[in-house]
């Protein structure tokens, strides 16, 4: 069993504490834009026939459900997350959906995915890779469980490139967002969010990390002026 670092345990406990309000807060804080980002990311999977998709850091299952809505009924989805509270909420959401027979959720960390080599046709992780303490290990694990020619799609917050937009973004993330989040949940959790985004590697550095673990044809797509970025690669 993979043992999380002290930092990893703190992150897991933090997400556990905000789990009941996680979806509502994301809608409020992003003004609903995150839904469009997820739809765009899932389209990049490009799985039109039967297959199996792994959604890492699935949270309460939003991306797993989006994958189910965009793919044929012959596609099955497995969602994993290291936060039990998120998985519990996700299971309720999946059970109440029309896709309940296609999605299974379980507790597991990105750094030790409990599946055999070459088990999946595609893998996704949305707003989760920045919370993985050992990102190289997490990327390597996702690479391991993919079949040859399998695709990885990563959606993550990023820093805008336009100077004026970048300044406004930093002001919102550092000053406004933590206060809004703190009104609904633990202030420290929504102070962590902007800090984790701002310390995330640049697009080119992160693509280099993907290449380092074996992904090829790595590219990225900026969304909403670069507030979010989708990274795509192939095993």
Swiss-Prot record:
InterPro entries: SAM-dependent_MTases_sf (IPR029063), UbiE/COQ5_MeTrFase (IPR004033), UbiE/COQ5_MeTrFase_CS (IPR023576). S-adenosyl-L-methionine binds at residues 60, 81, 126. GO terms for biological process: menaquinone biosynthetic process; methylation. Its EC number is 2.1.1.163, 2.1.1.201. Pathway: Quinol/quinone metabolism; menaquinone biosynthesis; menaquinol from 1,4-dihydroxy-2-naphthoate: step 2/2; Cofactor biosynthesis; ubiquinone biosynthesis. Transmembrane segments: none annotated. Keywords: Menaquinone biosynthesis, Methyltransferase, S-adenosyl-L-methionine, Transferase, Ubiquinone biosynthesis. GO terms for molecular function: 2-methoxy-6-polyprenyl-1,4-benzoquinol methyltransferase activity; demethylmenaquinone methyltransferase activity. The keyword Transmembrane helix does not apply. Pfam families: Ubie_methyltran (PF01209). It catalyses: a 2-demethylmenaquinol + S-adenosyl-L-methionine = a menaquinol + S-adenosyl-L-homocysteine + H(+); a 2-methoxy-6-(all-trans-polyprenyl)benzene-1,4-diol + S-adenosyl-L-methionine = a 5-methoxy-2-methyl-3-(all-trans-polyprenyl)benzene-1,4-diol + S-adenosyl-L-homocysteine + H(+). Methyltransferase required for the conversion of demethylmenaquinol (DMKH2) to menaquinol (MKH2) and the conversion of 2-polyprenyl-6-methoxy-1,4-benzoquinol (DDMQH2) to 2-polyprenyl-3-methyl-6-methoxy-1,4-benzoquinol (DMQH2). NCBIfam families: MenG_MenH_UbiE, PRK00216.1-5. Belongs to the class I-like SAM-binding methyltransferase superfamily. MenG/UbiE family. This is Ubiquinone/menaquinone biosynthesis C-methyltransferase UbiE. It comes from Citrifermentans bemidjiense (strain ATCC BAA-1014 / DSM 16622 / JCM 12645 / Bem). The lineage of its organism: Bacteria, Pseudomonadati, Thermodesulfobacteriota, Desulfuromonadia, Geobacterales. The gene is ubiE.
């Amino acid at each position: 069993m993979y043992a999380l670092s002290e930092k990893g345990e703190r992150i897991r406990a933090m997400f556990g504490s905000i789990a009941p309000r996680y979806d509502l807060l994301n809608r409020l804080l992003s003004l609903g834009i995150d839904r469009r980002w997820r739809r765009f990311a899932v389209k990049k999977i490009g799985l039109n026939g039967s297959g199996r998709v792994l959604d890492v850091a699935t949270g309460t299952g939003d991306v797993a459900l989006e994958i189910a809505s965009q793919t044929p009924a012959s596609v099955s989805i497995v969602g994993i997350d290291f936060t039990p509270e998120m998985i519990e909420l996700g299971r309720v959401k999946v059970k109440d959906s029309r896709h309940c027979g296609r999605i299974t959720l379980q507790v597991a960390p990105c750094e030790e995915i409990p599946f055999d080599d070459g088990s999946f046709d595609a893998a996704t992780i949305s707003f989760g890779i920045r919370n993985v303490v050992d990102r190289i290990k997490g990327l390597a694990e996702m690479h391991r469980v993919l079949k040859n020619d399998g695709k990885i799609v990563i959606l993550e917050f990023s820093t805008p490139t336009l100077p004026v937009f970048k300044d406004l973004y930093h002001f919102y993330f550092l000053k406004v967002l933590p206060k809004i989040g703190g009104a609904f949940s633990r202030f420290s959790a929504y102070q962590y969010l902007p800090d984790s985004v701002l310390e995330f590697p640049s697009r080119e550095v992160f693509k280099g990390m993907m290449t380092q673990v074996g992904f090829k044809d790595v590219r990225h797509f900026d969304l909403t002026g670069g507030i979010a970025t989708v990274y795509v690669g192939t095993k």
